[in-house]
Regions:
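Conserved AMP-binding/adenylate-forming core of the ANL superfamily
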Residues: 4, 26-78, 95-100, 153-156
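Conserved pre-ATP/AMP-binding loop-to-beta segment of ANL
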Residues: 24, 135, 149, 159-180, ...
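Conserved AMP-binding A3 loop
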Residues: 37-40, 176-204
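Conserved ATP-binding/catalytic segment of the ANL
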Residues: 55, 66, 357-359, 378-379, ...
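Conserved AMP-binding/adenylation subdomain of ANL enzymes
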Residues: 199-223, 231-270, 285-286, 334
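Gly/Ser/Thr-rich phosphate-binding loop
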Residues: 244, 266-274, 283-352, 365, ...
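Conserved beta-loop-beta connector loops within the AMP-binding
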Residues: 365-387, 423-424, 486-490, 533
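Conserved C-terminal "lid"/linker of ANL adenylate-forming enzymes
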Residues: 437, 463-469, 477-481, 491-546
């Protein structure tokens, strides 16, 4: 029987429309330079949609952007998908060769480029096969000098357009955004999300982080500062529902720790999300204690939230909570949420839950399986492969059907991560499959070791890799960066880990061997999305072992 009535499409316009109904006079602020009301922002979004039409862009085509976290990026997050185009959020930290691949693979017809990235784009322009127009973006007045062809400045483009625009009715299954994985092996893979997937993810995040006590407790009218780059999986979808909630936006542009600390204090920011390296940079900043950061709540992803980092944040009045996911899951899908029986625990014990990979978001499922896809016991020790499913997991690697098939098995998405479930239903990620250490046939959790080492007072950061061993196949090796002015010996770190083993927090046989299992370095290398680059560490070890 045919359904009767209007089939309401779940598109991003829902968030935009409701924000305009609820809080048309709320403020979107960009650094110390500009601010707009929601109404002014909405009119600029309509101008940008008209601009796409004036540039000859057709619905279904891809439009790319290289930009910091600015008001322009927020405008594009609405205008480009709602025009019916595929919004390619270009990762500005990729290598030139990766950028060439991604822009050509996406077939971007228009490329929006911040002035800071002009030298990079100019150097590769002759290898970009599909770009017809470049839109240049700058914070300053005056003309921009460039060798790029067919250019127009962003504000001039908007000035030429009318605010009179009716967003077309598009299918909720229309492709809305495209972002590329980090590509640590081979070319990056393009991950596509539809309007429906983005809407359902944003609603779930809004509910999970907003409705439950002792979490992030995101509410309407709060102050929001994104500290995850907006090119990274739509800044976790938070900019969408923050508009619906009528939140005040503080957009930081290019990240500068001293300025971010000042804005957090002056604007009384309520909530943010970021990778652990950003929070580490802020809470260990020499001036961190000069600012009142009490009441700021932060969700962390990209790498394990260590106890050291969570406790340092708590000392400054900052509540932290981990989240787990990947590009293909949009990204967040589990979070270190407290349950009612945890509400009255002392903060030290609450932190033990905040730093876990967590329980699934509303509408999400996760389990741990063995090699034959049998679910493993939720006993806190049975380690296996983490598989997930949600209404918003990607169903497409862009133009790569075979890799898409590999991503899904038995209707579950294979994350490529290793972990376990505890008796309370909390997921703990112990490793990426490619980073996992199997010593004598048993798993060693590098993330747990890294967390333990980081709690040594002199340690700034630690990373653990597997190294060849003739007897056990692999053994762990810890790379350790110390805090400025601090000293420590390998024996000190080993004794510290022995105390953890004696307390039952790690297995004794996990402890790296002396002397080869401890390497002190000036800093731990990170890739362009802020994750520890273990390929570099493996190369460093191989060079040292020669």
């Amino acid at each position: 029987m045919d359904r009767i009535g209007y089939q309401y499409p779940l598109t991003l316009k829902m968030f935009l429309d409701y924000g305009m109904i609820y809080a048309p006079n709320q403020i979107i602020k960009y650094r110390d330079q500009l601010q707009f009301t929601y109404t002014e922002h909405y009119n600029r979004v309509k101008r940008l949609s008209n601009a796409l039409k004036s540039l000859g862009v057709r619905p279904g085509q891809a439009v790319g952007m290289l930009e910091w976290d600015t008001h322009r990026y927020l405008e594009a997050h609405w205008a480009i998908p709602l025009y019916g185009c595929l919004f390619h959020t270009v990762n500005v930290r990729m290598t030139p060769q990766q950028l060439i691949y991604c822009i050509n693979h996406a077939e971007d017809v228009v490329l929006f480029v911040n002035e800071d990235f002009l030298p990079l784009v100019e150097s590769i322009q002759h290898e970009l096969k599909t770009v017809k127009t470049y839109v240049l973006m700058t914070d300053r007045q005056g003309e921009i000098s460039t060798t790029l062809p067919n250019v127009i400045e962003y504000e001039e483009l908007l000035r030429q357009q009318s605010e009179d625009y009716e967003f077309p009715e598009i299918s909720e299954d229309s492709k809305a955004t495209l972002c590329y994985t980090s590509g640590t092996t081979g070319n990056p893979k393009g991950v596509v999300f539809t309007h429906r997937e983005l809407v359902l993810h944003a609603i779930s995040v809004c509910m999970t982080w907003g409705l439950y006590p002792w979490g992030l407790e995101i509410k309407a009218n709060q102050v929001y500062m994104p500290l995850t780059p907006m090119f990274h999986v739509q800044a976790w979808g938070v900019p969408y529902f923050a508009f619906m909630l009528g939140c005040k936006y503080i957009l930081p542009g290019r990240y500068e720790p001293d300025k971010i600390l000042r804005w957090l204090n002056e604007e009384k920011v309520n909530f943010s999300h970021c990778v652990t390296t950003i929070l580490h940079m802020l809470v260990f900043h020499p001036d961190a204690e000069k600012y009142d950061l009490r009441g700021w709540k932060v969700c962390l992803g990209g790498a394990k939230l260590t106890r050291q980092l969570a406790e340092r944040a708590w000392q400054l009045g900052i509540r932290t909570q981990s989240a787990y996911g990947m590009t293909e899951t949009c990204p967040a899908m589990t979070t270190g949420q407290l349950k009612p029986e945890h509400f009255d625990l002392p903060m030290e014990e609450k932190i033990s839950y905040y730093i876990k990979s967590g329980i699934p978001f509303v509408f999400s499922q996760a389990k741990v399986v063995d090699e034959d896809f049998n679910e493993l016991p939720r006993d806190g020790k049975s380690v296996g492969h983490v598989v997930v499913r949600t209404p918003w997991c990607t169903h497409e690697y862009f133009k790569e059907p075979e890799k898409t098939k590999e991503l899904w098995k038995n209707d579950w998405l294979n994350t490529g991560d290793i972990g376990y479930m505890d008796k309370e239903g909390y997921l703990m990620i112990t490793d990426r499959s490619k980073d996992a250490i199997k010593s004598g046939g048993e798993w060693i959790s590098t993330l747990t070791l890294e967390d333990a080492i980081s709690q040594f007072p002199a340690v700034l950061e630690a990373a653990v890799i597997g190294i060849p061993d003739p007897r056990w196949d692999e053994r762990p090796c810890a790379f350790i960066a110390l805090k400025p002015g601090q000293t420590a010996l390998a024996e000190d770190i080993r004794d510290h880990l022995l105390r953890f083993a004696n307390e039952g927090k790690i297995e004794k046989w996990w402890i790296p061997d002396l002397p080869q299992g401890y390497i002190f370095v000036d800093s731990i290398p990170h890739n362009y999305i802020g994750k520890v680059d273990k390929n570099v560490l493996r190369a460093m070890y191989a060079e040292k072992a020669k």
